[in-house]
């Protein structure tokens, strides 16, 4: 049984990964909102990774960062604060999380880190 930490596992892709991994792994979910299920292999920490210290987790094999944030507006409608907020969530949050858990992760079984992005970064969207 692996120990998997998911940042953003309460909704979307993060939640789908959480549900897929629960039967055969211990899953630690860190998100502002709790997942809609309970399971003996699930431990949830309700917090914003940018605002609070991350919880101590003793054993980690996989770290998955998928906070799910994007501003789909025309660039002229985005404020500097919009850009700053997205950067904080998608870059600073990922770096903070990796730095916090890297020492523990290095001790894991075949450790891995998975960072999710948005399709808009690759695909391009009109007026975005």
Predicted stretch roles:
Residues 25-37:
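Conserved glycine-rich Rossmann-like NAD(P)H-binding loop of the short-chain dehydrogenase/reductase
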Residues 74-75, 82-84:
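Substrate-binding pocket helix/loop in short-chain dehydrogenase/reductase
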Residues 98-99:
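A short, exposed helix-loop element centered on a Lys and neighboring polar residues
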């Amino acid at each position: 049984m692996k120990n998997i930490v998911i940042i953003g596992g309460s909704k979307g892709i993060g939640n789908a990964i959480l549900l897929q991994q629960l039967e055969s792994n211990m899953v630690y979910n860190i998100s502002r909102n709790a997942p809609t299920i309970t399971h003996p292999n699930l431990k949830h920490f309700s917090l914003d990774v940018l605002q609070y210290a991350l919880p101590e987790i003793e054993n980690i094999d996989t770290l998955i960062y998928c906070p799910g944030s994007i501003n789909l507006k025309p660039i002229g409608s985005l404020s500097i604060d919009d850009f700053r907020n997205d950067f904080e969530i998608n870059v600073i949050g990922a770096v903070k999380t990796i730095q916090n858990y890297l020492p523990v992760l290095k001790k894991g079984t075949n450790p891995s880190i998975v960072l999710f992005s948005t399709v808009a970064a690759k695909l391009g969207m009109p007026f975005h």
